[in-house]
């Protein structure tokens, strides 16, 4: 093709079936701009109760914005004192837990007799920390103790008979479970005449409690313990407290950083005892942490940060979890129990590398699963069901969560191995995924879980049937509104009021977690001073908002799509959480974007003439080869005709991809690239779904 032929490159055939277009436009709109439409959210601004707010201001002396946040969390004046000022002295008596006396007596008797004890744990962070805590404590008590954690893929969660038989044959006298065991009635019954078992667990108790020597679980019937929110490591900590109190006459307060790590990671409500434990544990983590945790902080690049619950949940816990997902969780336990600096450094680095491996496996499966949704025609399904051969079963739950974030539909991700699919499910607010699976139990091999997350296995030949059954189930059980995620806004703020002082005042509510969620604020009208992609892969977005005194940065992780419809000079509304940004000694407020929308959305309209102009820009940017998607998008926005808005100009890339002019690929670093393809002859624009959809807006609206 000659250089000057590009003006005549496109043919615009207008013989369009408008009725079909009207029917299809919604589906194609989802296909072409899937990230955009799936990110649309409903804002719910929580109503105020100024009378309650004023009571808190008067009786607790808190800032008005803090009072409003406390009212939103149903915290009154009495509870407010404990919430804001609770200390370790307020922890409950561990002996009020049912069977604690029996457990303490049996453990002390076993230690005195120098008999062997095995701590039987679990491979998630709650189980890892509970195992580490109790093992360290029993060593301190002079016990002969070892630990056992089942392998995720071959053994699965909880007690298994084969493992217990090995433990018995090795001569153990007592098994103490942590974070598991409450549902293992048959297994405990099979071995309880040959070995003593103490169960410590926090999961919901079934009707039949296992016949162990002692069962410590605050959720079992007739347990008078008033705090029902402890994690698995929290229950193990209460056992340590009781033993130390009986032996030494004082509270056991060591290893609180380990307890905090598991408590945050298990996403239990951070209220009551959990809040006190996590506050104290974070203090220790920042002042004199466990050696293994300290080395984990180093490899995670957090050594110069004040560690928060957020750092635990999003940075430290995933590195410990990676061991159980990709290799074996015992390595994570070794990190937390060692006193050898060199060994701790070695294991921490191993976990860092294992986590990177987990991320790569997850990224690969996520990309394949995401592509399956689009290419197999399931974008408009009521439920997302994707399957792949030999997907790593240790990460499919994470992939399911990511797909829920993108498409906001109940999601099942299935790994097929030797004709059998092992699935992991994640749900949306208000939809019970466990009940959905139960409606299909006749075609499942097995299943289990709860309302928000579940797992199952199925013959691979029945996956399509499962998709159909769940689709029909969701048609009845899920309303259209439930497919739109809701952002609950605690309070609205003028953008000019956002400063470091308000961040400091709001931090009185930390640590955040389930039951005390991170406050979300809303700015209803702010002007975009600038927008840019950031990160090595250009997969994060920074939006700079104008303020009366300058500007404030707003960050959106994993939202490169914002670059396509938020532009300089726009007025936007933003839902966000607040945090400090500390850089080279300078401290400033920073908004973490939860949602952002233009006040006035720019209509997307495409024309053959406009595409010809963008075609020239793209061709020059690629120079017959390849370049980063970010660079090409920047060139389009910089050089586009003034009569085209940014959204329409960037949408041209989707048209070009559908016509085969360009293709998208990923380089060795994982960065999105655009490659120029040599195409001979004329191109028919009506073969582009995107062009048909957006060149006929007036017809289909």
Predicted regions, residues:
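Short, Lys/Arg-enriched N-terminal segments with co-localized hydrophobic residues
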Residues: 22-37
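Short alpha-helices
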Residues: 133, 210-264
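Hydrophobic helix-and-loop "lid/oligomerization" segment in the mid-to-C-terminal part
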Residues: 37-39, 46-174, 194, 244-463, ...
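Histidine/acidic-residue-rich, glycine-tolerant segments that coordinate divalent metal ions
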Residues: 171, 178-230
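Acidic/polar hotspots within intrinsically disordered regions
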Residues: 4-6, 13, 18, 31
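Generic structural signal for hydrophobic
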Residues: 167, 190-191, 656
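Acidic-glycine-rich active-site phosphate/pyrophosphate-binding loop
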Residues: 109, 204-217, 375, 545-550
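Acidic, two-metal ion nucleic-acid-processing modules in DNA metabolism proteins
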Residues: 139, 144, 275-318, 322-370, ...
């Amino acid at each position: 093709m000659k250089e000057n032929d590009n003006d005549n490159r496109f043919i615009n055939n207008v013989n369009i079936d408008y009725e079909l277009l009207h029917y299809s436009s919604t589906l194609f709109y989802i296909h072409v701009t899937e990230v955009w439409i799936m990110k649309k959210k409903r804002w719910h601004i929580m109503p105020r109760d100024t009378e309650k707010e004023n009571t808190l201001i008067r009786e607790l002396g808190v800032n008005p914005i803090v009072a409003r946040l406390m009212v939103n969390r149903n915290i009154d004046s009495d509870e407010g004192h404990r919430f804001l000022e609770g200390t370790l002295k307020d922890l409950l008596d561990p002996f009020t837990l049912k069977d604690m006396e029996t457990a303490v007596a049996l453990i002390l008797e076993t230690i005195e007799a120098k008999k062997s004890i095995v701590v039987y744990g679990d491979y998630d962070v709650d189980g890892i920390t509970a195992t580490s805590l109790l093992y360290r404590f029993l060593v301190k008590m002079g016990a002969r103790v070892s630990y056992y954690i089942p392998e995720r893929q071959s053994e699965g969660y909880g007690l298994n008979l084969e493992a217990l038989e090995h433990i018995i044959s090795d001569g153990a006298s007592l098994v103490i479970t942590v974070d598991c065991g409450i549902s293992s009635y048959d297994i405990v019954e099979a071995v309880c005449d040959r070995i003593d078992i103490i169960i410590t667990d926090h999961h919901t108790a079934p009707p039949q409690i296992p016949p162990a020597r002692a069962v410590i679980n605050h959720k079992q019937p007739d347990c008078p313990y008033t705090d029902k929110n402890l994690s698995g490591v929290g229950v193990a900590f209460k056992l340590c407290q009781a033993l130390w109190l009986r032996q030494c006459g004082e509270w056991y307060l060591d290893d609180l950083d380990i307890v905090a790590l598991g408590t945050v990671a298990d996403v239990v409500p951070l209220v009551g005892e959990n809040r006190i434990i996590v506050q104290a544990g974070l203090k220790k983590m920042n002042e004199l942490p466990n050696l293994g945790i300290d080395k984990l902080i180093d490899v995670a690049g957090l050594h110069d940060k004040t560690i928060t619950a957020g750092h635990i949940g999003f940075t430290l816990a995933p590195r410990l979890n990676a061991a159980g997902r990709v290799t074996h969780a015992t390595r994570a336990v070794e990190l937390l129990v060692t006193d050898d600096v060199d060994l701790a450094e070695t294991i921490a680095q191993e976990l860092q590398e294992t986590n990177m491996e987990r991320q790569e496996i997850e990224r690969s499966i996520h990309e394949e699963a995401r592509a399956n949704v689009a290419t197999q025609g399931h974008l408009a399904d009521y439920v997302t069901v994707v399957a792949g051969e030999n997907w790593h079963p240790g990460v499919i739950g994470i992939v399911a969560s990511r797909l829920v974030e993108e498409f906001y539909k109940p999601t099942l991700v299935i790994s097929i191995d030797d004709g059998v699919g092992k699935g992991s499910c994640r749900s949306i607010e208000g939809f019970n995924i466990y009940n959905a699976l139960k409606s299909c139990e006749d075609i499942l091999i097995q299943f289990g879980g709860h309302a928000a997350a579940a797992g199952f296995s199925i013959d691979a030949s029945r996956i399509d049937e499962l998709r159909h059954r769940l689709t029909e189930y969701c048609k009845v059980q899920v309303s259209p509104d439930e497919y739109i995620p809701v952002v609950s806004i605690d309070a609205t703020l003028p953008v000019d009021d956002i400063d470091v002082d308000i961040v400091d005042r709001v931090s009185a509510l930390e640590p955040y977690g389930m039951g005390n969620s991170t406050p979300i604020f809303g700015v209803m009208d702010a002007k975009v001073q600038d927008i840019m992609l950031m990160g090595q892969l250009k997969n994060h977005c920074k939006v700079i908002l104008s303020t009366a005194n300058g500007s404030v940065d707003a960050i959106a992780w994993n939202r490169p799509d914002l670059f396509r419809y938020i532009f300089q000079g726009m007025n936007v509304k933003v839902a966000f959480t607040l945090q400090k940004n500390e850089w080279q000694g300078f401290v400033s407020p920073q908004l973490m974007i939860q949602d952002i929308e233009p006040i006035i959305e720019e209509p997307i309209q495409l024309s053959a003439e406009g595409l010809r102009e963008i075609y020239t820009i793209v061709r020059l940017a690629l120079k017959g080869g390849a370049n980063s998607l970010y660079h090409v998008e920047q060139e389009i926005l910089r050089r586009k005709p003034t009569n085209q808005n940014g959204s329409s100009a960037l949408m041209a890339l989707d048209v070009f991809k559908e016509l085969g002019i360009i293709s998208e690929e990923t380089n060795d670093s994982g960065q999105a690239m655009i490659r120029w393809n040599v195409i001979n002859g004329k191109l028919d624009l009506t073969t582009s779904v995107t062009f048909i959809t957006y060149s006929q807006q007036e017809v289909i609206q």
